[in-house]
Swiss-Prot record:
Gene3D superfamilies: 3.30.1130.10. Pathway: tRNA modification; tRNA-queuosine biosynthesis. One of its GO terms (biological process) is queuosine biosynthetic process. Keywords: Cytoplasm, NADP, Oxidoreductase, Queuosine biosynthesis. It is found in: Cytoplasm. Disulfide bonds: none annotated. This is NADPH-dependent 7-cyano-7-deazaguanine reductase.
Length: 165
């Protein structure tokens, strides 16, 4: 199989762009996609994002997290540099941890219409408590909906050792 052609990547404008602008306000419109060349099979794509930051909506203090995004694509896939810039746009966004994870998941669902997706944020402790919100989605009426239910029921069954991340 040959590699991707330039015409296959016409919607990918940020990758390789040396004039990238970093946005400091929540910006879902920065997300870009490219075609999934393997729509006939299920496979996971996982992003490990260890430098996520946002702001507490009440105090304005910074929150830090590692975010894990896993999805099974259908026709479209998110381009990683656009995802990086999108996550960076949360830097001055004030929202609770749980809201940030759900917003990210909802934006990616709207962008790609994946078969399945999960987003898990592992936030560093503040005030002696770490918060690890997890959300997922499986396309309704499909095996992926059942998969989402199963993964939710079995999520995080075993306590972990928290070592201040």
């Amino acid at each position: 199989m040959a590699g991707r052609l330039d015409e296959d990547l016409k919607d990918v404008t940020l990758l390789g762009n040396q004039n990238t602008k970093y946005l400091f306000e929540y910006s879902p419109e920065i997300l870009e996609t490219f075609d999934n060349n393997h729509p006939n099979r299920d496979y996971f794509v996982k992003f490990n994002c260890p430098e996520f930051t946002s702001l507490c909506p009440k105090t304005g203090q910074p929150d830090f997290a590692t975010i894990y995004i896993s999805y099974i694509p259908e026709k479209k896939m998110v381009e990683s540099k656009s995802l990086k810039l999108y996550l960076f746009s949360f830097r001055n966004h004030g929202d609770f941890h749980e809201d940030c994870m759900n917003v990210i998941m909802n934006d990616l669902i709207e962008l790609m219409d994946p078969r399945y997706i999960e987003v898990w944020g592992k936030f560093t402790p503040r005030g002696g408590i770490s918060i690890d919100p997890y959300c997922n989605y499986g396309r309704p009426g499909t095996k992926y909906e059942k998969m989402a239910e199963y993964r939710m029921m079995n999520h995080d069954l075993y306590p972990e050792t928290v070592d201040n991340r």
